Amino acid sequence: MEAYKKEFIEFMVDCQVLKFGDFVTKSGRKTPFFVNTGFYRTGAQLRRLGQYYAEAINNKFGLGFDVLFGPAYKGIPLSVAATIAISEKYGQDIRYCSNRKEVKDHGDKGILLGSPINDGDKVVIIEDVTTAGTSIEETLPIIKAQGDVNPIGLVVSVDRMERGKGTKLSLIHI
């Protein structure tokens, strides 16, 4: 395991984002740990979180993409923190985008926040926790509805590696 991943786990514990005990996930499964990224509450924590994500994104995808998409709600601050960190650390000005849970019917209207997603854009999705892959399955149609775009991958802080439909891991299923 890379050093930054070990440091990230310690960071989650220090921020009380990662807790150990007896919990039940949204999918109804019992688990000995729980992750709540809503416990990142300060500017310093979000800056450091963005740096971890920036390193993971660069290691996995490089910087050859256009938009970092954070699904509502918890993906919104993740996408903002990571794009700031990418700009500071790598000098790349990546755009961020996220969605609203409900379409706005006044003002600027629409479902997207941040940058629009344009034809030809390569998009990386950023998430906090993946259990069954449900939020990603909901996110892909939103991204693809924006035009001829290419979702190239996903970066997630915690993949519970639970099984999806059949015997496939949830992220492989997607």
Where do the model's predicted regions map?
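PRPP-associated nucleotide enzymes
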Residues: 1-126, 131-172
